[in-house]
């Protein structure tokens, strides 16, 4: 795909294009695929691998919205697996050094129960201190061989969509001291919304 970069940062294997066959519920869907499984690697000859699939340049300064979305599916996942898939923010403002950092607060499918299921992610970058032009990368780390079968698929990557419902609270956490027989007030909370079909409702739980 034009503008995408496919990097084998450690080892020689990278991502590749894949189309699901007739036996899969996603038959005919074209995706990016990655796995470290290799049946030809003999026991004891396993090697670490790291592959990065990088988006085209994304215009943070001028984009209609700051929403980054994608779908991911993991197959042959195992509880406590060491294979990892991360979404990374990439800044290339310094031509001599590429800055790469995993996006915090985001967990990719990595358990047996999540295997075979598509998951959709909406990452709202509004208010983040990012470069005017940036990149996103899907980084996979594993060990190439017969013991690491985890396989991931990426599809429907978008940036700048304006049709997604969004709620943005001014506060994500509230903390204050409450004393007996004395009123206590939290900081004021405002909520801005986009593309909602229903009114916003507030529910409080616990001993308030």
Spans of model-derived segments:
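Short beta-strands within extracellular/lumenal beta-sheet-rich domains
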Residues: 44-63, 119-121
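Extended, low-complexity, turn-rich repeat/linker tracts enriched in Gly/Pro/Ser/Thr and Asp/Glu
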Residues: 60-64, 73-82, 144-147
